[in-house]
């Protein structure tokens, strides 16, 4: 295991108003610094085997049928760091049950974003996938099994600016902006992730891209991406707030 280092994070939150609102998006950044010693937290709702304190603060499965008759499901699991140290989110798994308790689907190796979250911060396990041979009423319950550990990798975030979110006929939404490397190390395979929230601060979708080129020290590069298979009724007007993360690919062993 790598030694626990002081972790640095820069979280950029862009509040995006719905169409027709004349207010300009606001930008808020926050600096998180890890504590050298981990103190015991009081009564966490979930605790991983290594003592990582977290809770599943929201989960939902939304089912829809696309234009060619294929059933899709969007699964969202929100994970909140309730402890006092940074947490690493590895790929997780979940089951989907119908209203009778019957198993409809079981999924593994489900992506999580971002890979490291600070105390009080939220991440998500997220997937959009097809449901084979499904003909139910769409009322599904998520049985989530996130993989959460205390982080032994640094929490690194890159600055994001010039962001706009707009409708896209094919991808549902289009996210455009720039990412800047203000650290002293170049990075490859940099993730840029958008998590979309409604007016009640509930996550309603996500999209991401991976920068194809190295992000050199001091460089600022543009990005543009859309959703993979967001629900058919998803538009930019559904989004009250978008939180963006840019960070290097990190694996914890």
Model-derived regions, located:
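Positively charged n-region of N-terminal signal peptides that target proteins for export
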Residues: 1-5
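Intrinsically disordered, low-complexity Pro/Gly/Ser/Thr-rich segments with frequent PxxP/GP/PP motifs
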Residues: 104-133, 205-232
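Bacterial signal peptide processing site
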Residues: 20-22
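Asparagine-centered strand-capping/turn motif at beta-strand->loop junctions
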Residues: 79-84, 179-183
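Terminal connector regions
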Residues: 131-170, 229-253
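C-terminal motif of bacterial Sec signal peptides marking the signal peptidase cleavage site
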Residues: 15-18
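Low-complexity, acidic Ser/Thr/Pro/Gly-rich terminal tails and inter-domain linkers that flank the onset
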Residues: 43-72, 143-172
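Short acidic/proline- and small/hydrophobic-mixed sequence motifs that coincide with surface turns
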Residues: 84-89, 103-104, 184-189, 203-204
């Amino acid at each position: 295991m790598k030694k626990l280092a002081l972790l640095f994070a820069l979280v950029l939150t862009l509040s995006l108003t719905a169409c027709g609102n004349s207010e300009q998006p606001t930008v808020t950044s926050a600096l998180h610094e890890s504590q050298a010693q981990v103190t015991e937290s009081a009564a966490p709702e979930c605790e991983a085997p290594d003592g990582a304190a977290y809770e599943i603060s929201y989960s939902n499965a939304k089912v829809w049928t696309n234009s060619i008759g294929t059933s899709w499901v969007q699964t969202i699991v929100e994970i909140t760091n309730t402890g006092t140290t940074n947490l690493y989110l590895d790929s997780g798994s979940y089951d989907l049950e119908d209203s009778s308790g019957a198993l409809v689907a079981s999924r593994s190796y489900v992506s999580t974003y971002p890979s490291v979250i600070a105390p009080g911060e939220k991440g998500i396990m997220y997937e959009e996938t097809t449901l084979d041979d499904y003909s139910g009423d769409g009322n599904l319950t998520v049985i989530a099994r996130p993989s959460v550990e205390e982080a032994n990798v640094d929490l690194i975030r890159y600055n994001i600016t010039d962001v706009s979110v707009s409708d896209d006929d094919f991808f549902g939404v289009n996210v455009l902006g720039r990412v800047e490397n203000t650290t002293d190390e170049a990075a490859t395979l940099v993730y840029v992730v958008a998590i979309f929230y409604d007016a009640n601060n509930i996550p309603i979708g996500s999209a991401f891209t991976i920068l194809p080129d190295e992000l050199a020290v001091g460089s600022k590069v543009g990005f543009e991406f859309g959703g993979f298979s967001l629900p058919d009724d998803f538009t930019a007007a559904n989004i009250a707030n978008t939180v963006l993360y840019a960070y290097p690919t990190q694996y914890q062993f």
